[in-house]
């Protein structure tokens, strides 16, 4: 795994109820700006790196740890909801990324981008995005989420992952090298997200704050974003791996509702920036280049 380069700048927000850690990667002459939303909820931005830093080769990229995860943890036990995340994003944009808005969301971050856009369209958030890049978006409805949960559980309990777990248990690695054992344990915990479980070794490790994840999903209730998404008029790209445990049908329904450009990746699960980085880069770069006039005027 290549090291994560230091950001151009970093700090914490001063306008959110809880200070949120942010960082930005800025090229010498950025064409425009992107706000990148990590998955989870309850995770942090670093597991998107270093692979997604191709986004910062031509554009300023702002990333932040959403409330309750990473370096934005809080001792406040007030439940964090999807409204919390949308309100935080609104404040982060006003403080750190004023001007024409491009949201790049991965997994839960893509769903957050959609929730924010719906709220913005109703006048309950900040500015409307000029464009959206949605990478392997989280399920767009409770029904699609149930399908994902069942498929991920099936993969994790399947013979391939179970054989890898048995090999780890028999290896003696826990005693010989506890750090390597923890790394391998992490890899096996996310193996079901990948088309090839061995590729999990190339993902930067991360932790999810369970209470944040639980309270956020619970706050969505029996959700279905698709009818509301059909009312939006925003240029978008939806990228999804064909072997993602999140149903391709969910991503396709989001794309249909938005009238979005699509890119379905073969031999790819939920982590395209690890599994198919070249194809991902080509699709995202082409979309951003084609729509640059929307943010540069």
Where do the protein language model's features map onto the residues?
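Short beta-strand/loop motif that positions the catalytic acidic residue
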Residues: 232, 238-240
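Conserved HGGG/HGGXW glycine-rich cap/lid loop of the alpha/beta-hydrolase fold
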Residues: 18-74
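Conserved hydrolase catalytic core segment
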Residues: 99-147
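Flexible "cap/lid" loop of the alpha/beta hydrolase fold
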Residues: 126, 130-172, 208-209
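Conserved alpha/beta-hydrolase "acid-adjacent" motif
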Residues: 245-250
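Conserved alpha/beta-hydrolase catalytic His-Asp/Glu region
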Residues: 165-219
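Active-site loop/oxyanion-hole signature of alpha/beta-hydrolase fold enzymes
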Residues: 66-108, 282
């Amino acid at each position: 795994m290549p090291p994560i380069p230091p950001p151009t700048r970093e700090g914490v927000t001063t306008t959110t109820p809880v200070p949120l850690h942010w960082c930005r990667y800025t090229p010498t002459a950025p064409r425009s700006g992107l706000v990148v939303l990590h998955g989870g909820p309850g995770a942090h931005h670093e597991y998107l790196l270093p692979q997604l830093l191709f986004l910062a080769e031509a554009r300023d990229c702002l990333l932040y740890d959403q409330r309750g995860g990473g370096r934005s943890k809080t001792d406040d036990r007030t439940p964090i909801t999807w409204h919390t995340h949308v309100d935080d994003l609104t404040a982060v944009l006003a403080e750190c990324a004023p001007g024409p808005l491009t949201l790049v969301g991965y997994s839960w971050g893509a769903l957050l981008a959609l929730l924010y856009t719906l709220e913005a369209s109703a006048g309950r958030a900040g500015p409307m995005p000029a464009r959206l890049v949605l990478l392997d978006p989280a399920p767009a409805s409770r029904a699609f989420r149930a399908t994902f949960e069942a498929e991920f559980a099936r993969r994790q309990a399947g013979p391939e992952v179970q054989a890898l777990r048995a090999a780890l248990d028999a290896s003696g690695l826990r005693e010989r090298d506890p750090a390597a054992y923890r790394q391998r344990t992490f890899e096996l915990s996310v193996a079901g997200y990948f088309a090839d479980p061995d590729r999990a070794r190339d993902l930067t490790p991360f932790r999810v704050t369970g209470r944040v994840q639980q309270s956020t999903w619970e706050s969505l209730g029996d959700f279905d974003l698709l009818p509301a998404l059909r009312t939006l008029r925003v240029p978008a790209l939806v990228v999804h791996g064909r072997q993602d445990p999140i149903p391709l049908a969910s991503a396709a329904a989001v794309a249909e509702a938005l009238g979005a450009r699509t890119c379905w990746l073969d031999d790819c699960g939920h982590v395209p920036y690890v599994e198919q980085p070249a194809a991902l880069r080509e699709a995202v770069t082409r979309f951003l280049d084609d729509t640059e006039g929307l943010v540069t005027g």
